Regions:
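Short beta-strand to alpha-helix junction loop
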Residues: 19-29, 69-87, 98, 148-156, ...
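Conserved redox-cofactor binding core of oxidoreductases
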Residues: 39-125, 130, 137, 146, ...
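An anion/pyrophosphate-binding glycine-rich loop and adjacent beta-alpha core
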Residues: 161, 167-278, 339-345
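FAD/FMN-dependent oxidoreductases across multiple families
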Residues: 260-305
Length: 480
C-alpha cells in the first residue's frame, strides 16, 4: 500500500528536518503527471508481468522508501530517460544544439537581469548567445572531489555562473557520498550498486575483517551515510586507500545471475569478482545544495532559472532520498516550461542582439600551462576529499579554506588565466569549493550529510545555509 502522503513523509524523514515542505508536496503531487509524460514520450520502462498488479509497470523500492513506488527501466533508468529525450530533441525543428561550444559565463544587462550566456568554441573563440530566458541544467558539484560516481562530473561551474550574477546558493555543505565506488585511480568511475550489499556482500578492512558488525546491528545494510562514514574511517587508519567488498561466498552462479553488469565491468578492469574482493571507496554522488529557486525554477536573478542538481529547491533538505532527484528534474522542468509559455513573449520586448552584450575580452595570445592547471585542480580535489567530505572538523575546514585560497591566488597570478575558457572554469570551481567550506563552517551541528566531529549533535532548529558572491569576496579579503 502506498499514497502521496507516505512518499511525502519518507522524503521529509530523509531530509533530516531541512526539507521545504511546500517543495516536497509539490514534487510528489506532480510526480505522476511527469512520469506519464515520459511514458507518452516513449521511455521504455520495465513492464509488470503480474496481471493482478495495480500498475502496468514494475515498481521497485530503494533506500528510504517504505513502499515499492519507483518506476524503472531495468537497472539503467537514467540512461533510458536521457537517450529517449535526447532523440526527441534531435528531431525537434525548433531546437538548435551547439555541441561545439563550452559555456563559461552568463550575460547580464545594466538592470541586473540575465540576458543569455557566452562560451568558447574549439578554436578558443568567444560566442554570445542572447536569450529572453536562460535555464541552467549543468549538474552538481561532485567534480570537486577526488572520487566520484560519474565518469565526467561537473564541478559546480553552473552554480558559480549564477552566483556571479547575484544568485543565492543554498545548502552547499550537503554533498551526498555513495559508499561503494570502484577504486581505480587510473580508470573511469564505476558505481558498485547497493544491491551487492543487499544480496549479502561483506565489507572487509585492510586485514580482511568485517568491520560493520561492530558498528551497527544492520551491519552492511545500515543506512548509506552510516556505511560511508565507517568506510571512510577504515581508509583513514589504513594504508590501502580503500576497503574491500567481498561477494565470493555467494558463489559464481549467484554472482553471474544477480550482477552480470558489475561482473563484466570489473573483469574489463582486471578483477574477477567470483575470485577476488572488489576494492571500493566512498565517492561524491549528488549535490543537495545549489542555486536557490522557487517552484517554477526561478532564481532571484531576473530571467535566470535553474533545474535539477544545479538547483536547490528545498526538496532534498539535508539528505536526498533515492530516486527523488530524477523526479525533481522532471517536475520542476515542466513547471518552469509551463511558466515561461504562459508568460508569452510580448512582455519581454525585442530580444537583445548578440552585439549588445559581449563576453570579457580575452588576453592576447594567452597560453595557459595545462600542467599547472591540472595540478591546481588535483590539489583542490585532494583538499576537498581530505577535509570537506564525509567527516569534517573545524580544524580540517580551516586548513581546507587556507589551501583553497592559496590555490585561487596561484591561478589568478597566471597571465590570462581568467580570460581563457579553461582558466575561467577552474576559477569558478575553486570559488565554489571555497563557498562549500564556508557553508560547512557556518553549520555548528551534525545534520544529514554534514557530520562534524566538533559538533556531533543537532541544533533544535534546522536552518538552511545561504551564501552569495559577496560572502565569497568577504572571505577572500580576510587575512590578505
Amino acid at each position: 500500500d502506498d499514497d502521496l502522503d507516505a512518499h511525502i513523509n519518507d522524503t521529509l524523514v530523509a531530509g533530516d528536518g531541512l526539507c521545504d515542505s511546500e517543495a516536497v508536496r509539490f514534487t510528489v503531487t506532480n510526480g505522476p503527471a511527469a512520469i506519464q509524460w515520459l511514458i507518452d514520450n516513449g521511455v521504455p520502462f520495465t513492464p509488470e508481468h503480474d496481471p493482478a498488479a495495480r500498475y502496468p509497470y514494475h515498481l521497485t523500492r530503494e533506500g528510504g522508501h517504505n513502499a515499492r513506488r519507483i518506476i524503472h527501466a531495468d537497472d539503467a533508468t537514467g540512461r533510458a530517460v536521457v537517450d529517449t529525450l535526447v532523440a526527441k530533441v534531435a528531431q525537434h525543428p525548433n531546437i538548435t544544439q551547439r555541441n561545439d561550444l563550452t559555456v563559461v559565463g552568463l550575460l547580464q544587462d545594466n538592470q541586473g537581469a540575465c540576458r543569455g550566456a557566452y562560451g568558447s568554441d574549439t578554436n578558443q573563440q568567444w560566442h554570445s548567445l542572447t536569450a529572453r530566458h536562460t535555464v541552467l541544467a549543468t549538474g552538481g558539484a561532485s567534480g570537486l572531489y577526488r572520487h566520484t560516481t560519474t565518469p565526467a562530473p561537473s564541478s559546480g561551474e553552473g552554480m558559480m555562473m549564477a552566483a556571479e550574477l547575484g544568485a543565492r546558493l543554498m545548502n552547499l555543505e550537503f554533498q551526498q557520498f555513495h559508499p561503494t565506488c570502484l577504486f581505480d585511480p587510473e580508470g573511469p568511475a564505476f558505481l558498485i550498486s547497493e544491491a551487492v550489499r543487499g544480496e549479502g556482500g561483506h565489507l572487509l578492512n585492510e586485514v580482511g575483517e568485517r568491520f560493520m558488525l561492530a558498528l551497527d546491528k544492520r551491519a552492511e545494510l545500515a543506512p548509506r551515510d552510516v556505511v560511508a562514514r565507517a568506510i571512510d574511517a577504515e581508509i583513514q587508519r589504513s594504508t590501502l586507500g580503500h576497503v574491500w567488498l567481498d561477494i565470493r561466498h555467494l558463489g559464481e552462479k549467484a554472482i553471474c545471475h544477480h550482477f552480470p553488469t558489475i561482473l563484466a565491468h570489473c573483469a574489463s578492469r582486471g578483477i574477477d569478482i567470483t575470485q577476488q574482493a572488489i576494492p571500493v571507496v566512498p565517492a561524491a554522488h549528488y549535490s543537495c545544495g545549489g542555486v536557490a529557486t522557487n517552484l517554477q525554477g526561478a532564481t532571484n536573478v531576473a530571467n535566470l532559472y535553474a533545474i535539477g542538481e544545479t538547483a536547490c529547491t528545498g526538496l532534498h533538505g539535508a539528505n536526498r532520498m533515492a530516486s527523488n532527484s530524477l523526479l525533481e528534474c522532471l517536475v520542476f522542468a515542466r513547471s518552469c516550461a509551463q511558466t515561461l509559455l504562459a508568460q508569452g513573449q510580448e512582455q519581454f520586448g525585442q530580444a537583445a542582439s548578440s552585439s549588445e552584450f559581449q563576453p570579457p575580452a580575452r588576453a592576447a595570445a594567452a597560453v595557459l600551462p595545462k600542467e599547472v592547471l591540472s595540478d591546481i585542480r588535483q590539489q583542490m580535489r585532494t583538499t576537498m576529499s581530505q577535509h570537506v567530505s564525509i567527516v569534517r572538523s573545524a580544524a580540517g575546514l580551516s586548513a581546507a579554506l587556507a589551501h583553497l585560497k592559496a590555490l585561487l591566488n596561484s591561478l589568478e597570478e597566471i597571465n590570462g588565466a581568467l580570460t581563457a575558457p579553461e582558466g575561467k572554469r577552474l576559477h569558478q570551481t575553486l570559488q565554489l569549493a571555497i563557498l562549500t567550506v564556508l557553508a560547512a563552517q557556518q553549520r555548528h551541528e551534525s545534520r544529514g550529510l554534514h557530520y562534524s566531529t566538533d559538533w556531533p549533535h543537532q541544533q533544535p532548529t534546522a536552518v538552511a545555509s545561504s551564501l552569495s558572491i559577496n560572502d565569497l569576496s568577504e572571505a577572500l579579503e580576510k587575512n590578505r
